[in-house]
Amino acid sequence: ASSATGDYGASSATGDYGASSATGDYGASSATGDYGASSATGNCGASSATGYKGASSATGYKGASSATGDYGASSATGYKGASSATGYKGASSATGYKGASSATGDYGASSATGDYGASSATGYKGASSATGDYGASSATGNCGASSATGYRGSSSAEDAETIAVAWGYKSKAKGVKGSYLVFADWEGDESEYWKPDTWTLKGAKMVQVDGETIKEDTWYIIENGEVKELEE
């Protein structure tokens, strides 16, 4: 077990089942052993867990968190935090404003809940979700799912067996040939877009990217029940 609580402190646990924690500002924490846990809670802190089943968490302002081992979990909750889980079945979550979350392993899950956040799942059957306003979500793996639920969010499907869901008000979606796009048709006062409880769901529609009626790599939106190509 390793712990550094002072400002600018560094903490490292490399043995199996080790635990590492750095709670001071600018602190760094690393646990590379199997089942290791790493946590950096200070401002601008960095946390990394590379061992099998490792867990990594960075909760401070601009914190960075990375879990590269199998079944690893990574979470960055601070403002502009970055979270990455590259191992098999890894989970990555960034909840801060403008946070970035990426899960590249098979069955990985990636979630960005802050406004302007970015979420990407590239592994087989990965799931990617961006719930903040103007958030971007992308699923590039086979059978993956991408969802953007915030106002004017972006959702993209980069594989033929992937679904992109544009569920947020005024959200857009695109995909490659063979993929499916799902849209929610909302009615509401756009000047008060930040009040989702005032939106009214009029319906939903799913289309397949066939390369003709619905073009590849082209943004689409839904208006009055009709899926339309977005005019930038």
Q: Which residue stretches match the model-derived regions?
A:
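Thr-biased low-complexity repeat/linker tracts and other Thr-enriched repetitive architectures
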Residues: A1-S156
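Intrinsically disordered, low-complexity terminal regions
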Residues: S93, S156, I163-E232
